[in-house]
Amino acid sequence: MAHKKGTGSTRNGRDSNAQRLGVKRFGGEVVKAGYILVRQRGTKFHPGVNVARGGDDTLFATIAGVVTFERYGKNRKRVSVYPLEG
């Protein structure tokens, strides 16, 4: 027999809220300046052409244009925004 009180359910029951990270605008999408492209922790994606990085590593567009995801270097990815022609 157990000589200590089972305290499983009273000591559990906590969880943190989801951080809602991830890609918010995908390749080929047309965006305006200021649109958030990727929410991330660290630099899973690096900022490319016409993309800036916020204080929490969020990537956002600095001009209106089309989003592209590119590989550069051996194992890095970057997000760029190129202006629309026309």
UniProtKB/Swiss-Prot annotation:
Keywords of this entry: Ribonucleoprotein, Ribosomal protein
UniProt GO MF annotations: structural constituent of ribosome
InterPro entries: Ribosomal_bL27 (IPR001684), Ribosomal_bL27_CS (IPR018261)
Keyword DNA-binding: no
Residue numbers spanned by region Disordered: 1-21
Bias (Polar residues): 7-19
GO CC annotation terms, alphabetical: cytosolic large ribosomal subunit
The keyword Ribosomal protein appears for this protein: yes
One of the protein's GO biological processes: translation
PANTHER family: LARGE RIBOSOMAL SUBUNIT PROTEIN BL27M, RIBOSOMAL PROTEIN L27
Family membership noted in the UniProt record: Belongs to the bacterial ribosomal protein bL27 family.
Protein name (database record): Large ribosomal subunit protein bL27
Organism lineage string: Bacteria, Bacillati, Cyanobacteriota, Cyanophyceae, Acaryochloridales
Gene: rpmA
